[in-house]
Each structure stands twice: as structure tokens, then as C-alpha cells.
């Protein structure tokens, strides 16, 4: 959608282990911990950071979803703060997380605010979608 801005730290193409080509070409190359946008730019931000640390450097999952960093709790807190910074005063943050290696309850503690609501989905209900209001942060 031309109204959306896709930001990712990666800009790459690779061939996955099953032979498929993966292309990641964001509109903006940037780190979610230090976004290249002015304060109060967006009404809605979707934050879907890499959630896995224990991955091989060339694994399918690392290429497709990205690999988290060793200081992920600090990075996730910084990412949440950046999302709130770029949101307009009544903005909404949609956060997607998979609980395979860290529970969503831990993420909520890291963020320091409860979501307005959430929804579990995916295999074994490990994927969580959460909605946060900037005004509650």
C-alpha cells in the first residue's frame, strides 16, 4: 500500500535452503532502536522485531525473519520507546511477538505498560498480537 512505510535493517536477497529466493527491500533501511523519522510522524506503527536468538547464521528462519541481538531486552525496550516517539499523541502501536524463546508476559514487563488488548494466533497459539495506545505509555 502506498500509504505504508516499510522499514527494515536488512536490504538483501538470498536463496533459501529450499531453493526459493528471498528479497527484503524496505522503503527505509533503518534500525528500530533509532528510527530515521521525526517525532509524532505516524498514527499507526506495526512493530514486529526478530524474536529468535538461537539460530544458525544461514538458517532459513534467520534469513526470513531476521535474527535478534544478544541484548534483546534492552533493544526491545529501545524499540518500544522509538515506536512511541514516532507515533502521534493518540497513535496506536500494533506489536507482534512469538513466544518460542521469550514469553509475551516478559515483553509487557520490558515495555512497562499493559496492552489495550491482545490476540493469540498461530501454531500452539505462540504468536501474540498486542495493541498499545501511546497515551497510555
Give the role of each language-model region.
Residues 1-137:
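Class I S-adenosyl-L-methionine-dependent methyltransferase catalytic core
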Amino acid at each position: 500500500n502506498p500509504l505504508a512505510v516499510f522499514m527494515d535493517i536488512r536490504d538483501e536477497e538470498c536463496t533459501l535452503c529450499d531453493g526459493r529466493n528471498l528479497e527484503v527491500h524496505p522503503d527505509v533501511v533503518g534500525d528500530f532502536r533509532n528510527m530515521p523519522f521525526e517525532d509524532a510522524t505516524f498514527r499507526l506503527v506495526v512493530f514486529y522485531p526478530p524474536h529468535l536468538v538461537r539460530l544458525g547464521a544461514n538458517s532459513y528462519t534467520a534469513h526470513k525473519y531476521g535474527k535478534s541481538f544478544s541484548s534483546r531486552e534492552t533493544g526491545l525496550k529501545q524499540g518500544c520507546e522509538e515506536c512511541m516517539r514516532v507515533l502521534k499523541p493518540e497513535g496506536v502501536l500494533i506489536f507482534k511477538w512469538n513466544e518460542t524463546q521469550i514469553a509475551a508476559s516478559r515483553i509487557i514487563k520490558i515495555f512497562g505498560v499493559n496492552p489495550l488488548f491482545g490476540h493469540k494466533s498461530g501454531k500452539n497459539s505462540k504468536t501474540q498480537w498486542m495493541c498499545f495506545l501511546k497515551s497510555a505509555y
